[in-house]
Amino acid sequence: MSDYKFTLNLPETEFPMRGNLANREPEMLERWTKDGLYQQIRDSRIGRTPFILHDGPPYANGSIHIGHSVNKILKDIIVKSKTMSGFDAPYVPGWDCHGLPIELKVEQKVGKPGQKISAAEFREECRKYAAEQVNGQREDFIRLGVLGDWQNPYLTMDFSTEANIVRSLSKVIESGHLHKGVKPVHWCTDCGSALAEAEVEYEDKTSPAIDVAFVAADSKAVAAKFGVSDYSHPVSMVIWTTTPWTLPANRALSLSPELDYSLVEFEKDGVTQALILAEVLVESCLTRYNVESHTVLGSAKGAAFELVRFNHPFLDFDVPAILGDHVTTDAGTGIVHTAPGHGQDDFVVGQKYGLEVANPVGDNGVYKPDTEYFAGQHVFKANDNVVALLREKSALLNHVAYRHSYPHCWRHKTPIIFRATPQWFISMDNHGLRTQALKEIEQTQWIPDWGQSRIEKMVENRPDWCISRQRTWGVPITLFVNRETEELHPDSVSLMERVASRIEQQGIQAWWDLDAAELLGDEAEQYRKVTDTLDVWFDSGSTFSSVVAARPEFHGHGVDLYLEGSDQHRGWFMSSLMISTAMNGKAPYKQVLTHGFTVDGKGRKMSKSIGNVIAPQTVTNKLGADILRLWVAATDYSGEMTVSDEILNRSADAYRRIRNTARFLLANLNGFEPAKDLVAVEDMVALDRWVVRRAAALQQEIIEAYEQYNFHIVTQKLMQFCSVELGSFYLDIIKDRQYTAKQEGHARRSCQSALYLISEAMVRWIAPILSFTADEVWQLLPGERDAYVFTQEWYQGLKSVTLATDLSDDYWQQLLTVRNEVNKVIEQARRDKRIGGSLEAEVTLFADAALTEQLTHIGDELRFVLLTSEAKVLPLADATSEAVETELASLKLLVASSTAEKCERCWHHREEVGTIEAHPTLCTRCVTNIEGDGEVRLFA
């Protein structure tokens, strides 16, 4: 055999079977960086149609988690596939760099601004900290194989971006959308300042829980809504609250529109009255009020009482009943005391009804001098006095001490209050922002499509946007306000441009360093500088203008796609929509794609306490980034994305299937030079032409799936092709021809040409997803080529050629089905020890007339398709009793062990082995392939 071994065309490649991705990928990254790969891609697309995916900036704090990885990998797949489709698709990653979490981290290191460190020094420390965080996250993102302008990302703290954020605000102001108002915030009376959510801790506290009656301004009319006519006793709505001190600020009573309310009459202490209570809470309430017997006079929905007036229990005005979604029946009466100046829900519903945002409480937690009854009292100490006054006014139905969870200041560990403070707002309705935003939502493509109704509901119901914050590390609201009238300076827009020019040179500190007289001259004494900073959502929400419109690589082209997690309907998608519509009257994006959150194998959120966190760094260090990328691509991102070690191991198994296919292709292109060896598709063996045709059709399906962002369909089709059409059929069949045919003969070159065309196409199909592996394959493909697959376009060499004499795709599909049936019978014969390998088998196919015509069409080459040494086709009626039935009614099979000698070179059992004097151990075909012109194959 050794003499003939060297006449075989054995596969050979440097492409290793094991990916060893964890070690090899970093080496590839080094080469990508050294070669300036991203710039090579940019250069290859100069002048092409732009496609702009704008990166929603992650927050520059902490390490990246699996959700970050999903997001960046999805973006990278899209950018690479769009580039492959010929677009100029730059990717500029960004980071959100201002805001409270960074302030808190820096506070822990250097103390609060204004105490141990000046505000200017504090901002500089925040800038340094954010830069460190960006550097750490950047390395992790690069490790994932994400290509982008990593050396020149956008940061919201870049001086130029900070300046452009100010310019965006000036355009919003110029369009008339800014107004000043008040909004309740967490307020620490010990700090004398507002607290952000992150500065609030919840501890148990004992508070007075009271039930208070608000008597109807017109009891008879209210009773009539319950179907009770000419009612002569007082009718009251009852609220339950644990903050009696907020009652001076009460401006409404909130009911749930669809909840059933009862009118309940009873007599107590000689007085007959009727109370309005939620139907499901009547019994528990009356038990609290020590009412022994009562009569239900009627029932009505909450919606019936909208804008009906009720008297304040101790102040000389009445308040409306209003409707709110925040009303529940978990506790209390089903009617909520509403003080817009002292609660977020109260404020939101108050905005809807145009209620006064009353704030009788000063910075120090003491009632202001004009507060009737309680002026000069601290709110918590006033609780008892409020209760006493209610008792005196006969409005108190119940009073108990109540233990509950209550917000406390994280620094002082003392209870805090909600308190309305002056803030800056973008109005939703003063200049039609809400209406226009809803129109723009309709013009945008939302993927998945339920995203549209979700953001529509949010826009329909959202209050004005409070854009001001009382923070140190943020872009300043660069306004001058008249000290007497509180009006903006009439030249605010031009003044903001002058400030922006300074910020462009010196950063946001330029605002705090600015002496008003430098810009206002003699007017400086009449105006004060606003010291508030912008909500960080304004920073990121304006990047379509501050970054995309400003950077040259975007060519002034608008954004095509925003892509973030599904929580961003409320976040970045919303803030971007509001700012763009306020500035330009249109949405900042054409498409918005959202992906679900990552959960573990049991559907639980990632949690350190549960111990189910999958860190992307761990995955890349153990399995490699391509495995993580394949998991992301193969998962339907429209819902929750399930990940676990087991799931990632399954991805690794799928990866091996693709890698093994690539290795087979490369190994069998050994010695193939496309420039001289490529066989035209129309001249190929029929089976080769069929597989090229299948690949061409598949390429169209894959491109379409990429276009529709259906990456899980890309991976499904790729796996199907590798496993079934190639792995189980084509590659299996051609091994004999590839290894044993004449090296330079048509039969082999036809096969190699098909493998080459498939390889050229497949390396491009996988490049957006399996980027490292695609690069590895690309470097080993034969023929002259550019340095990187990522600068290429979809392969144009796949031709869907069908000759008149060709067998149809249905024909080959039928042969695949027949072959599967033959394999089952051969496998059983092997288990029964009747044969060894399939080449020891001779198979007789008993087929009906139609199937016989198909099977005999390819003559003796049928045996090559079936991988047997002999294949005979006989009429189905001739089937012997030993013939095995198959799943095809038209086919029965009989397998026997060949009695012919085995060819030493090709291992086929042939009658002529031993009859050729010069080569007694070979078959005629092998002799032809060694010494003659090579065998002729027409079909397989």
From Swiss-Prot:
Catalytic reaction list: tRNA(Ile) + L-isoleucine + ATP = L-isoleucyl-tRNA(Ile) + AMP + diphosphate
GO cellular component: cytosol
GO terms of molecular function: aminoacyl-tRNA deacylase activity; ATP binding; isoleucine-tRNA ligase activity; tRNA binding; zinc ion binding
Residues given in the record as ATP binding sites: 608
Motif ('KMSKS' region): 605-609
InterPro entries: aa-tRNA-synth_I_CS (IPR001412), aa-tRNA-synth_Ia (IPR002300), Anticodon_Ile_BEm (IPR033708), Ile-tRNA-ligase (IPR002301), Ile-tRNA-ligase_type1 (IPR023585), Ile-tRNA_ligase (IPR050081), M/V/L/I-tRNA-synth_anticd-bd (IPR013155), Rossmann-like_a/b/a_fold (IPR014729)
Compartments in which it is found: Cytoplasm
Entry's EC annotation: 6.1.1.5
Cofactor: Zn(2+)
Free-text comment on the cofactor: Binds 1 zinc ion per subunit.
Keyword annotations: Aminoacyl-tRNA synthetase, ATP-binding, Cytoplasm, Ligase, Metal-binding, Nucleotide-binding, Protein biosynthesis, Zinc
Disulphide linkage map: none
GO biological process: isoleucyl-tRNA aminoacylation
Motif 'HIGH' region, residue range(s) on this chain: 58-68
Subunit text: Monomer.
Role description: Catalyzes the attachment of isoleucine to tRNA(Ile). As IleRS can inadvertently accommodate and process structurally similar amino acids such as valine, to avoid such errors it has two additional distinct tRNA(Ile)-dependent editing activities. One activity is designated as 'pretransfer' editing and involves the hydrolysis of activated Val-AMP. The other activity is designated 'posttransfer' editing and involves deacylation of mischarged Val-tRNA(Ile).
Domain commentary: IleRS has two distinct active sites: one for aminoacylation and one for editing. The misactivated valine is translocated from the active site to the editing site, which sterically excludes the correctly activated isoleucine. The single editing site contains two valyl binding pockets, one specific for each substrate (Val-AMP or Val-tRNA(Ile)).
Family: Belongs to the class-I aminoacyl-tRNA synthetase family. IleS type 1 subfamily.
The protein's name in its UniProt record: Isoleucine--tRNA ligase
Gene source species: Shewanella baltica (strain OS155 / ATCC BAA-1091)
Lineage: Bacteria, Pseudomonadati, Pseudomonadota, Gammaproteobacteria, Alteromonadales
